[in-house]
């Protein structure tokens, strides 16, 4: 039952999919945290895997960078493979001084400079928000693990190299916790197709201070976030 961008067979994906941007990060998650892992798709090297976590069937697949790529894979996973829960796991940049490098942010809502949700919502503003049951499950898991989290709005940017750095001042004033590139599109697709979605990201760098995590720090913080998210997935 291949689609234009996924060559998995019918039933290859679990109902819950962890959705990092980097396909090699998907491979790392599958090989490190899942058991009985099988690679189920590799079109354009956008790797997808299915395995088990503490006995529960879980999938993980790369989404690529940006809303267009993420939206394509999310659409096909939901519509053609019956995926019910998509949880973006990745990294973001912080703006506010009260958000620190290595913090974990849960995107309750996603603002954006993209027009993609206006295109699907008849040129009106769509409130791109996370599914509450997913958000609640991850918050509960974070508390159980003692993981410090921040819950609030993220900003999904179309441009990585922005020509308007003054926009960061506006974001900070409006309480944006982190800048990434996919959540608003993911939330829009999920709402449109009747699925559930959530964005969970670690702060890898601070846009204001220039502070960045080392590769080792990034891996440790990311791993803590993945375990927290996988344990939440057990309750879905």
UniProtKB/Swiss-Prot annotation:
Catalytic activity, as annotated: a purine D-ribonucleoside + phosphate = a purine nucleobase + alpha-D-ribose 1-phosphate; a purine 2'-deoxy-D-ribonucleoside + phosphate = a purine nucleobase + 2-deoxy-alpha-D-ribose 1-phosphate
UniProt-recorded Gene Ontology molecular function terms: purine-nucleoside phosphorylase activity
Key word Transferase present: yes
Keyword Phosphoprotein (UniProt): no
GO biological process terms on file: purine nucleoside catabolic process
Entry GO CC: cytosol
Active site: 205
Residues at which a purine D-ribonucleoside binds: 5, 180-182, 204-205
Superkingdom of source: Bacteria
Keywords: Glycosyltransferase, Transferase
Residues the record lists as binding phosphate: 21, 25, 44, 88-91
Enzyme Commission numbers on file: 2.4.2.1
Pfam families: PNP_UDP_1
Residues annotated as site: Important for catalytic activity: 218
Quaternary state and interactors: Homohexamer; trimer of homodimers.
HAMAP family for the chain: Pur_nucleosid_phosp (MF_01627)
Function: Catalyzes the reversible phosphorolytic breakdown of the N-glycosidic bond in the beta-(deoxy)ribonucleoside molecules, with the formation of the corresponding free purine bases and pentose-1-phosphate.
PANTHER family named in the record: PURINE NUCLEOSIDE PHOSPHORYLASE DEOD-TYPE, URIDINE PHOSPHORYLASE
Family statement: Belongs to the PNP/UDP phosphorylase family.
Descriptive protein name: Purine nucleoside phosphorylase DeoD-type
